[in-house]
Amino acid sequence: MTQITIPAQVVNGHLQHEKSLAELEGEDVLATLTVVPKHAPPIDWQKSRDRIDSFNALKDGWDSYRAPAPSTDAVSQAKLFLEEAATSKFAPSRFSPAVVGGVGFTFKRAERKVYVEFRNSGSVHALLSDGVSDPVVEKVQPNQSAYADLMLRIKGYLHE
């Protein structure tokens, strides 16, 4: 039994590799496929902090419609959450001002998504969705301890 490693990639749904298997003709071969996803480049946490700070400069109607600008409290809570994400070494896929007033973060992996929203009202909610079953919405207490728990929940949900 021979075991070999062949670097390959998936292109248009097909496995492509550059190594010929002709040299193994007639041998019993154990083939194991390990999929290692490509990851986005590492996040620049300081740039992300600065970007969230920039949300304080937005005015009502920032989206060219009637979106309320994020409140200073929503921005502060979003920064606290970003710090917890940095501590957890788990970067959001994206974050932006929310059109309902506040700041929203999206975490995605395959079909699963978690959207965390810091509303101008002071409330914080997390929506967990897999694209198949009904989304689940959870209320989150606006404090660092709850954000640490939420980061664990997000990691677990996206990697189930």
What are these regions (language model features)?
Residues 1-92, 125-160:
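Eukaryotic low-complexity, non-globular regulatory regions
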Residues 75-120:
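Amphipathic, interaction-prone secondary-structure segments
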